[in-house]
Every structure is written in structure tokens, then in C-alpha cells.
Curated annotation (Swiss-Prot):
InterPro entries: Deacylase_DtdA_archaea, DtdA. It catalyses: a D-aminoacyl-tRNA + H2O = a tRNA + a D-alpha-amino acid + H(+); glycyl-tRNA(Ala) + H2O = tRNA(Ala) + glycine + H(+). One of its GO terms (biological process) is D-amino acid catabolic process. D-aminoacyl-tRNA deacylase with broad substrate specificity. By recycling D-aminoacyl-tRNA to D-amino acids and free tRNA molecules, this enzyme counteracts the toxicity associated with the formation of D-aminoacyl-tRNA entities in vivo. Keywords: Hydrolase, Metal-binding, Zinc. Its cofactor is Zn(2+). It comes from Caldivirga maquilingensis (strain ATCC 700844 / DSM 13496 / JCM 10307 / IC-167). The keyword Glycoprotein does not apply. The gene is dtdA. This is D-aminoacyl-tRNA deacylase. Its EC number is 3.1.1.96.
Length: 269
């Protein structure tokens, strides 16, 4: 698997993780913005991470199989947090980059196994917790993508221990790709969950890997359901509907669409 790293110079967490990773992997500078090594390529941009649209063309030209965006995380009620997610916009709102109504390709196995590995190690990072987020924000990339993030204030973004923690996870992925890819688990999509998943115990217990997650604040449509299922590296077999979060119409539609697409439906009540 050919992996590409996307770094933003204006993102304190991003450039910090990148600096730590360069201490673990011998990268050669190709030009001002590009680096290569035996384990990965890297693109370093002056843009904020959600607006690095050139990552799409760069990944295509370099035949990249998986992109990892190294990023900061922000939230309304800040707390120390390590988080992972797929980028994309379910609606036409592109305030945070990307394209209207388009999502990147999710890599359920890598996304979920990075989370599992971080969850296993999080005791090393005093005061932090770890989670998976719903699919949100840009940029749009027509390649498998995982965002790896440090949250949620400049104190954490600049925290060398948090930067080293994520750099070590990325280093483990680069050196042990098979561990993250060949786990033999079914993939799932999630409809109607909170922005920060409530499926942690099911995921940690290995019941399934999770790709795209459509949060409760997005009203699902047949188009959204189809994108959530089809924009994955592996075909999901499980569709999880968070029953109480959806109105009656959305429940019926989501169950019907997931079933028609061949998924086994789990209703979380």
C-alpha cells in the first residue's frame, strides 16, 4: 500500500506531528513541498488542512492508495482529544472546504484500527481521550482518506507528547500495514449517531469496522445513504440505524435503502 501524508504549515498540530514523524522516518526532500521515503510520500502545504484541494491531484499523479491528513481538532467544549474520521460534506455547505454533497472514500479498516490502537495506548497520554467522528469537512479527495487529529486547543496542538503519540501511530501503520488492513471484520456504516460515535464498545470489541458515519444533525436521504455505502474501500455488510435519533420518515427510508443495497440492518434503540 502506497501511503501519502498531507501536512499543513499553518496547523500547529499538523506540523508538530510531521516534525516528530521525520525523527522516526528518513524522508528525502524532493522540493519545498514534497518529501519521499521508503514508507510514504508527503505533501506539505501553506493552506489550512481542510482546504488542501491539491491533495487530490497529487495523490492521483503519485498513485497513492491511502492519504493520511495530519490535523488539529476543534470543538465547542474543548477537551484533550485524539480523534479520527473520514472527510466529506453530506450537504452543500462548504464553509470548511470540500465539494458540495460529496464525500471522500472511507477506509473502514485503517480508520477503525487506528482508533483501536490509539484506544489501547491512550493511557500513555495523560488526560486525553480518543474517539471516532462522523464524516465532515473538506477537502474532497477521490481517494481513501483518514484524518488523524489532536484536539482541542492550542495547548494540545502544541503538546509534544500528543504529537509524538500520533506520529508513533502513523509510524506503526507505515511499518505494519497488514495489521491495519487484514483484520477480517465486516465493515459497517452508521446513520443517525452523535457526531462523536456512541459505538465505541462495539468497535473495541471487534464486532465490525466502521466507515462513513452520517450524524444525527444530517437528515438522511437515499442519495446520502447510497454515498455512505458505496464510497468505501470495502463494501459494508452492516447498516447501523440509531433509531431514536431519526424521525419516523427517516427511519423507514434508511432501513429500506440499506436493505435494498444488500446490508444487514441493525436498529440501535
Amino acid at each position: 500500500m502506497k501511503i501519502g501524508l498531507i501536512v499543513s504549515r499553518v496547523d500547529e498540530a499538523s506540523i508538530g506531528i510531521w516534525s516528530m514523524l521525520k525523527g522516526m522516518v528518513k524522508f528525502k526532500e524532493i522540493n519545498t513541498n514534497e518529501y519521499s521515503s521508503d514508507l510514504a510520500l508527503a505533501l506539505v502545504s501553506d493552506k489550512d488542512i481542510v482546504y488542501v484541494d491539491e491533495a487530490d491531484e497529487w495523490a492521483r499523479v503519485n498513485d497513492i492508495d491511502l492519504l493520511l491528513f495530519l490535523s488539529r481538532h476543534e470543538m465547542k467544549n474543548p477537551k484533550p482529544l485524539i480523534t479520527f474520521h473520514t472527510p466529506g460534506n453530506w450537504t452543500n455547505d462548504v464553509e470548511l472546504g470540500g465539494k458540495p454533497g460529496q464525500v471522500a472514500i472511507s477506509e473502514p479498516r485503517v480508520l477503525t484500527n487506528l482508533f483501536r490502537e490509539a484506544y489501547r495506548r491512550i493511557g500513555e497520554l495523560n488526560g486525553y481521550s480518543v474517539t471516532l467522528e462522523a464524516t465532515h469537512h473538506g477537502p474532497f479527495v477521490d481517494k481513501p482518506v483518514v484524518f488523524v487529529e489532536i484536539g482541542s486547543t492550542s495547548n494540545e496542538w502544541r503538546d509534544p507528547k500528543a504529537q509524538e503519540f500520533l506520529a508513533s501511530l502513523v509510524f506503526d501503520l507505515l511499518n505494519n500495514t497488514d495489521k491495519y488492513i487484514n483484520d477480517g471484520k465486516d465493515a459497517a456504516v452508521s446513520i443517525g449517531d452523535l457526531h462523536y460515535t456512541t459505538l465505541v464498545n462495539h468497535i473495541i470489541n471487534g464486532e465490525y469496522d466502521v466507515g462513513h458515519m452520517v450524524p444525527k444533525y444530517i437528515k438522511p436521504t437515499p442519495t446520502i445513504i447510497k454515498m455512505a455505502v458505496e464510497r468505501n474501500t470495502v463494501r459494508p455488510r452492516i447498516g447501523i440505524i440509531h433509531w431514536k435519533s431519526l424521525d419516523a420518515e427517516s427511519r423507514v427510508m434508511s432501513e429500506k435503502e440499506l436493505s435494498n443495497l444488500g446490508l444487514t440492518v441493525i436498529k440501535r434503540r
